[in-house]
Amino acid sequence: MKAFRFLPLFACFLFIVGCTSSTTEIKTGPGPGETWRAVHFLGYETDRELRELEKTIPKLAEMGVNTVIFEIDYNFNFNSHPELRRGASPITQKGSHRFAETCRKNGIRIIPEFQCVGHQSWEEETFPLLVEFPHFDLTPGAFPDNTGIYCREWDVLNPQVNSMIFELMDELIEAFNADAFHVGMDEVFLLGSEHSPSTKGKDPGELYAKAINDMYNHLVKGRGVEMLMWGDRLFDGKNFEFGRWESSLNGTASAIDMIPKDIIICPWHYEKMKAYPSLPIFIEKGFRVLPTSWRKVDATKELILYSQKLKNPKMLGHLFTSWGKTDWLKYQPLEEGLKLLLDK
């Protein structure tokens, strides 16, 4: 009988040990001070496509990847606003849960992305928000069939847009059990446009900062998650030869001094350059920085080497993109770039 008295205590001991080991066995994502080795996924729009991508996760983890930014946009089976689902079979909650769990089991942090403000169309296709709610369009009635425009944008001064988009963000955070969120925000060109009834003549920098701060208040202050965004609209290109794409020539760059400094900035540069001044500028302003490259191996390596030479703790690591489906296990910029990142 005495032996049986100790069984409950012994069982509790085993339970505690089991819980402790299960929570410490797998470290998810980069730890404090550890280099981010991140990849950006785009173009996977159904559960079936997500399952195929999932098969590469263990190997990517072996290669050294520890962070995934998954751009999902409207390709999700939203419950709050089913009218905003894109495609016949968008990604489901079950599919996203499964993918996120596979990432975590392999030590990879998963960060969903939803493109905000800009990129509300591509070529002739306008995306669901502005199709279902055309009065949310920043330039309503202008640019029929999206001709003469890069991408449509939503109206940053319409409070109804935020309330709707924030509900979508909340669903994606829950679906991926995420502790960070990427809001996009690149290549925004129409703030203050003469074609925009609500923002015509207004300061693009102030408008852009308002949009960022609205999202920050919801995501960081409200949900307690980290916020990431692209950096091109915050990098003033007037004194540099980076052009209108990788830097801002339309007045949005002044927003850099109007937004919280704990946002993670992802400045993207795709060509080989002698220097990448956006990186030290963002660091000096107090931001953490995650430089981003694309398909050119030499440019990718140059950007990584330049970032490493800065030797600053706010330099997080590197983000690799392909801007479409690709064989990530044979993607040369990733292979060669990881060698430099792991060499440290």
Language-model region placement:
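Substrate-binding cleft of secreted/luminal carbohydrate-active enzymes
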Residues: 290-344
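Active-site-adjacent "subsite" loops/lids of carbohydrate-active enzymes
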Residues: 117-171, 291
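C-terminal motif of bacterial Sec signal peptides marking the signal peptidase cleavage site
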Residues: 17-18
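Active-site neighborhood of glycoside hydrolase catalytic domains
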Residues: 159-286, 298
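Aromatic-lined carbohydrate-binding/catalytic grooves of carbohydrate-active enzymes
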Residues: 61-95
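Glycine-rich, aromatic-flanked loop segments that form ligand/cofactor-binding clefts
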Residues: 34-37, 59-72, 100-142
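The substrate-binding groove and active-site-proximal loops of carbohydrate-active enzymes
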Residues: 38-48, 81-93, 146-163, 197-207, ...
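Short, acidic/polar
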Residues: 46-61, 166-169, 273-279, 300-306
